[in-house]
Amino acid sequence: MWKSVIYLFVLLLGVIRAEDVKDLRNNEVSIKGRLELSEIDISAYMIPRCSFRLYQIGNYSADKPFHQITRIKDKNGTFEFNHVPINHGVNESTYFVMTPSSRDFNLLPQRVLVEVTNIFNETTGKVEQQLKAFRNYFGREYFPSKDIHFPDKLEEMDALPYISIKMSKMLPFRDYLQQRNVGLLQSGPLAGILNSKWKIAAVITLLALMTFPYLVEKLDPETARAMKEEARKKQREKYVVKEE
């Protein structure tokens, strides 16, 4: 009798696992992320200038690897990859690589290895997906060769409730279009003077010294004559020989 009960229990457990694996074939997951720009507010202008790419690596059950590009959904910086397929079977892992891209910022991490593993929960009797994320950089392998004794391990990062992407620094301004025929005020000696505050100040001072005598002569002729007379007097004194 006990053998029959145990046999039925094992059979029932196998049926449950088989049903879970069967349902898993059409199972899909969503991978969520968030762009954090510290004190910079995410504007409507910035949303289309940031994108996030997810592509599948390693073994995959479909004819070709999964690939999807998404953008920021709101001003909080949240983004999401929907209908992401996973491999069949319990304890099977599916791997994806997520790369952020922005026209305005350098974002970190540069690449994120996402691991989705099917875990059988004995308490609920259902198959659940375990999500992990690992920080990666250009030039480092996702899966090191087994011949390497001490391979570099990827640093694990928080994957729940979302994968955090942060700003490293602002990108420099890039002027892709350059005007071929520029004016005199944009290139040449005159442009060099206009683009320098010190040169402009020197030119203004020189013009003021040159025009000052003419302005005084027009506005106050008597003062102008007195100044000229004083200048002649000093000039004559240079050639006067003092008698002993």
UniProtKB/Swiss-Prot annotation:
GO cellular component labels: endoplasmic reticulum membrane
Leader sequence residues: 1-18
Membrane-side (Cytoplasmic) residue stretches: 217-244
A Pfam family assignment: SOP4
Signal among keywords: yes
Location in or out of the cell: Endoplasmic reticulum membrane
Biological process, per Gene Ontology: endoplasmic reticulum to Golgi vesicle-mediated transport; protein transport
Topological domain ranges for the Lumenal compartment: 19-199
UniProtKB keywords: Endoplasmic reticulum, Glycoprotein, Membrane, Protein transport, Signal, Transmembrane, Transmembrane helix, Transport
Protein's membrane topology: Single-pass type I membrane protein
Record keyword Signal present: yes
Residues that carry a glycan: N59, N76, N91, N121
Residue ranges the record marks as coiled coil: none
Membrane-spanning segments: 200-216
The protein's role, per its UniProt record: Involved in the export of PMA1, possibly through the monitoring or assisting of PMA1 folding and acquisition of competence to enter vesicles.
Family in the record: Belongs to the SOP4 family.
Protein's name in the database: Protein SOP4
Source species taxonomy: Eukaryota, Fungi, Dikarya, Ascomycota, Saccharomycotina
Gene transcribed to yield this protein: SOP4
